[in-house]
From Swiss-Prot:
Tissue: Expressed by the venom duct.
Protein name: Conotoxin AbVIH
Pfam families: Conotoxin
Annotated S-S bridges: 43-57, 50-61, 56-68
Family note: Belongs to the conotoxin O1 superfamily.
Keyword list, A-Z: Cleavage on pair of basic residues, Disulfide bond, Knottin, Secreted, Signal, Toxin
Propeptide position ranges: 18-40
Compartments, record wording: Secreted
GO cellular component, one term: extracellular region
GO function term, MF aspect, one: toxin activity
Organism per entry: Conus abbreviatus
InterPro entries: Conotoxin
């Protein structure tokens, strides 16, 4: 009887662990998709408003005018 009880408890633990890991895997997939959507964020075109956190399509955000601009060299 004791052996049967030990086997039953072991089986319950394995089943619970398997179910829990599936739930976590779904959670990871959602997190991964969210990260991918943040990485594919579009850039702000030249002439549009920007700030220190804006990703301009061109490499420069003029914080004085708050517009995405191409840098001018003298």
């Amino acid at each position: 009887v004791l052996i049967i009880a030990v086997l039953f408890l072991t089986a319950c633990q394995l089943t619970t662990a398997e179910t829990s890991s599936r739930g976590k895997q779904k959670h990871r997939a959602l997190r991964s998709t969210d990260k991918d959507s943040r990485m594919t964020k579009r850039c702000t075109p030249a002439g549009d408003a920007c700030d220190a956190t804006t990703k301009c399509c061109i490499p420069f955000c003029n914080l004085a005018t708050k517009k995405c601009q191409v840098p001018t060299f003298p």
